[in-house]
């Protein structure tokens, strides 16, 4: 959700921003099917299904490599997500379901920009990151190996290296 917020900040306050990192995100609004799925998940949460929803989310947040080699990080992440209130989860899903597209602003971005994505990200596949990088003049793209939607946890060394290099560049 951070990428959606960052793109809207650039849209409204570009003169205040020195650099942009778009990480495992996309510029598209939800289509009707994705929006309906978010509202199904809201209903599930309201009917006591928070644990099921979050367990299902973990199945698509992490790469197959992480499932095979680092089950502990999945457990820690699930435990952390379970601490969120139902209302926070519902408001987050509503915000994502109703967000506007921001693809139309990408070509106008004139600040340094880096796009990062996990090689095995199911939620925001690398093709969506490639599209954004191609639209933002002068931007760079890094696809982080052996990671899904949470590369900062799954392959933190590669993630941090790209982050540090970008931040040192300006």
Protein language model annotation of sequence segments:
Residues 1-31:
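Conserved hydrolase catalytic core segment
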Residues 16-19, 112-114, 137-140:
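Structural signature of beta-strand start/N-cap positions in the alpha/beta core
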Residues 29-36, 48-108:
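Conserved alpha/beta-hydrolase catalytic His-Asp/Glu region
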Residues 45, 49, 81, 121-124, ...:
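Glycosyltransferase donor-binding loop in the core domain
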Residues 57, 93, 132, 159, ...:
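Hydrophobic "lid"/C-terminal helical patch
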Residues 109, 115-117, 121:
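Short beta-strand/loop motif that positions the catalytic acidic residue
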Residues 111, 125-134:
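Short alpha-helix in the alpha/beta-hydrolase fold that links the catalytic acid
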Residues 138-170:
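Catalytic active-site module of serine/aspartate enzymes centered on a nucleophile-bearing elbow/loop
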